[in-house]
Amino acid sequence: DGQVVVVYDNLEESWIAGIDAATGRENWRTARDEQRSWATPLVWANELRTEIVVPGMNRNRSYSLTGELLWEFDGRMSNLVIPSPFAAHGMVYIASGYVGDQHRPSFAITPGGAGDLAPEGLDGETSHI
C-alpha cells in the first residue's frame, strides 16, 4: 500500500511505524512495550485481511496497516527473538530460539484473531493458535 514498515525495538524506546515510500514521511507510529528484537516483521496478506506480524520478547503482536493492534499474546519467547515470522498453508508461524537457551517456542496462527490470543500453558492452544 505504498509504505515501508519499520520496527525499532530496543532497551530505551520501542515502536513500529509506517513510512510513506514515495515521500519518506511517517504515516503512523505505535509504541511497543518491548526490549530488543532482531526479527523482521512480516506483512501477511491472508484470506481475511493484511496484517503486520511482529514477534517480541514480551508479546507477539499483529498490527493493521495503520498501526492498530489486532492481536497479541505472551509467547514466553527465548532470550532473544531472532527468527522472522513466515506464512504458509494459510497460517503465520512465529518461532524463537537462541544459542544456549533451551526454550525455543513455535506457534502456528490462523487468520482472524482479535485481542489477547494467549494459550493456556506452554503447550496450550486457542481458536487461533
Task: Specify the residue positions occupied by each region the protein language model found.
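Noncatalytic, solvent-exposed loop/strand surfaces
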Residues: 1-129
